[in-house]
Amino acid sequence: MLSPDVLKKLEAIEQRFEELTQLLSDPAVAGNGDRFRKVAKERASIEQTVTALRAYRKLLDDVAGNEALLGDKDPELRELAKEELAQLRPQVEPAEEQLKLYLVPKDPNDEKDVIVEIRAGAGGDEAGLFAAEVMRMYVRYAERRGWRVELMDTSGGALGGVKEATLTVSGDAVYSSLKYESGVHRVQRVPATEAQGRIHTSTVTVAVMPEAEEIDVQVNPADVEMDVFRSTGSGGQSVNTTDSAVRLTHKPTGIVVKCQQEKSQLKNRTMAMKMLRAKLFEIEQERQRSARDATRKSQVGTGDRSEKIRTYNFPQDRLTDHRVNYTRHNLPAVMDGDVQDVIDACRTFYAAQALREASRGDAGAAERRA
């Protein structure tokens, strides 16, 4: 059974949902576009929780009703009640666990768009080839989700691979899903260039950063040095006759970003500034996390790039996410963007972890009050 504290929190959310529903029908709110969107967004953010709570109540009512029938004089009715209970009772605990997960505090960055950096690591040309495949995997996943992808910068490698690539992904709550991709992705397979048929291990590093708005990060123009140059193709040759590519250097931190995908220097500068703000935002987020808890290890999804998070074993047609001990097969589908189940496994695991931490915090607060 859910504890009284958990039920109280869920009922408060339901009450807020009802208040927001009434506000949406208020002419004063309906006539104010900004207010209406804000109210509608908040209501949508808790609607799933309320729906689950009401379904849970109905489930408990159904269980109680059938338990009452177990004492009925009619043996046929008692048998039907037993059959119903055999189906209903196993649903109670999973429903309760799901409701608890809805109470996990939301990451304030979850609704943000993201910047994804993909870099070939150890493994030479094979790492570059896999980096290109990982990039395509995210593009295909974004297409499945109805998100928009823009290539901001790329550095070509041999055999059609990439040394590094930077993408922006925009859409509905992009960071809430892609944040679990930060880290080292390891591939085990026989490279196309391997004549002896030996299995090689290569790595690709992925960094996912929430896109920062100007309100999130203030950048002093005097701290930014801008260089312009001609865009280059994958082989290094110039592909533009004007200096449209832009390189920005943030002098206080030494961060360097560049963008050369657009023909317009202004557009490249705008996109480069977007990348710079995201990197500075990430630094500030990391500083705050470290200040809150230097020993906390729930870094996944918030950017620990040195962590080996996943292995793609092609000879065994197997993907393993080492953080959550999740395994699945059919790598061709994975590389074509079919990764929602992996992301869901990560989300469930870390939400449960956050809930345990929050519960320990609540227990500690209760002890202090006592």
From Swiss-Prot:
Chain residue ranges for the region called Disordered: 286-310
Stored Gene3D superfamilies: 3.30.160.20, 3.30.70.1660, 6.10.140.1950
Function of the protein: Peptide chain release factor 1 directs the termination of translation in response to the peptide chain termination codons UAG and UAA.
PROSITE patterns linked to this entry: RF_PROK_I (PS00745)
Primary subcellular site in the record, as a coarse category: cytoplasm
Entry's localization field: Cytoplasm
Record keywords, A-Z: Cytoplasm, Methylation, Protein biosynthesis
Compositional bias (Basic and acidic residues): 286-296
InterPro entries per UniProt: PCRF, Pep_chain_release_fac_I, Pep_chain_release_fac_I_sf, Prokaryotic/Mito_RF, RF-1
Record protein name field: Peptide chain release factor 1
A Pfam entry, by short name: PCRF
PTM: Methylated by PrmC. Methylation increases the termination efficiency of RF1.
Cellular component aspect of the GO annotation: cytoplasm
Record gene name: prfA
Record-listed N5-methylglutamine modification sites: 237
